Amino acid sequence: MKRIMNLYESCKTPIRVAYFGFVLIAIGFLIQNESVNVFYTFRSNIILFIAELFLRIGEFMIMNLPIIFMLNIVCKRANNASPVVMALVGYFTFVVTTMLFSNQSLNAQAYSTGFGINSVFNYSSGTRLPLETGMIGSFLVAYATRAAFIFSRHRRDYSITNVLSKDTAGIIYNFVFCFVLGIIVSYTFPSAYTYLQRAITFIGADLFDPFRIGVYSVLDRILSICGMNNIIRYPFWYTSAGGSFANTVTGQNVLGDVNIWTYLKDSSSTYFGAGRFITPFYVINMFIIPGFYLGTLFSMSDKSDRNSLIPLFIFAIILSFVAGNPLPCEFVMLFTSPFLLIAYLILVGVVSGTLVNFEAFLGFSSKITNTVIAMPGSFADFIINIRNASLIRSVNTILIAGVICFVLMLVITMFYYRYIAFDFVRTGKGAQVIDDIIEIAGGINNIDRAGSGLFKLNIYIRDPEKISFEKIQEIGIRRVVETKNGLSFELGTSSCAIAQRINRRLRA
């Protein structure tokens, strides 16, 4: 748990950037959204310009999240500015290496067009592009940079640090490390991509099979976290893998789930099943994610901490409704409670299959064609679809499934924080941590009560003079803060369970 919280601390700022980026995108999206324009149309050029500005800035933030994560990790871990330069050199070395060494015969979604890096060297078929490695590539480079930084700080016989400065040596080491990583990824990525293509073929073989749609939804969320969801979204949203619709009157053939939904929305034609790949997002954004937020909030037993965070959680829930993208919340789950992320993915897969089984289909249309920052399943799209009489059955099914998923996610989250998070891997250290905390506080009789905040344990002390500060150094808890009422321990998601057990001892 300590390692998980250390990683969370390293990634806390990029997660905030993700939230802020989607706030900007949501503002721009709402102003330009056709669903909102049904109720009110913004005609001011200034407002439309601001919307476009926010949309593009937010898009740039989200598209470059892997680099932001990488830079923040190397800064936090090294507590030094020089790793930033090392990381950038290493990242571009890694990217260029994947461009020159990788197989260029994969689908276009397997390659990245970021930063405009390309090459026509020794490639007769066209331009070579780097592989789209997303978060995986950025984390590989981050830890390669960390290793290079540490390696450059140790002087050895015949080491280049005896000739060059430590920072220069670190850059050279990282160049070599990232070059090797780039070659390894160049030859292993196509194999992994082949399996993804098989999954896409498997899903596309029967677009009405609940299991296949469930697999799609789980893969979509996993690849979104990895920053690579365009690999699976583009084929189903915009190509024949997501279905096709032929207008017998005009002879027009429309490909892809999102394209079909958009076309049907603007015409009088009908097509059963359009929106199947978008429908689960309404449940995710409006019910499952709020269930996680409220479950986390209700798990805090310290009223002062809980009350101070209520506005923040309300804002996060509103953002989930409006922005229609669960990615920031999924980052929080990944870096604080992987168990909850797994439970969340299972729930997403099950509800996706269930919606198809009950023939509930509800799509979305948007001017945003970038699948990475697309916001399907927003409240604005949901409201506008309620007005369509032919969609009432789908809307009602989504509401029923959503309420059930909300309750399930709420219960799972609270159960995890209160019971499972305590000594999750069953190392036997959970009880020892409680004993150590009681000893630090000066004994059980010196504790008035215990309460849990967001990833922290608050111990209210009767006599501050009895606190054993020497013991804090011995047990190696990541962070302990002395407050006006006692001590605050940063214990991660196990804080709630530990607070409950300490209070039980106080009542015994």
Regions found by a protein language model. Name each.
Residues 182, 186-251:
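Aromatic-rich transmembrane-lumenal/periplasmic boundary elements in polytopic membrane proteins
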Residues 31-55, 96-132, 159-163, 193-204, ...:
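Inter-helical loop and helix-membrane interface segments of multi-pass membrane transporters/permeases
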Residues 44, 48-52, 249-251, 255-270, ...:
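Transmembrane alpha-helical segments and their short flanking loops
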Residues 3-158, 165, 336-349, 353-358, ...:
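Early transmembrane hairpin of solute transport permeases
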Residues 46-47, 63, 132-136, 166-172, ...:
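Membrane-interfacial loop-to-helix junctions in multi-pass transporters
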Residues 53-67, 122-140, 212-237, 256-289, ...:
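Hydrophobic alpha-helical transmembrane segments
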Residues 435-508:
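Structured cytosolic domains appended to multi-pass membrane proteins
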Residues 14-18, 22, 26-30, 64-71, ...:
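Transmembrane alpha-helical segments of multi-pass membrane transport proteins and ion-pumping complexes
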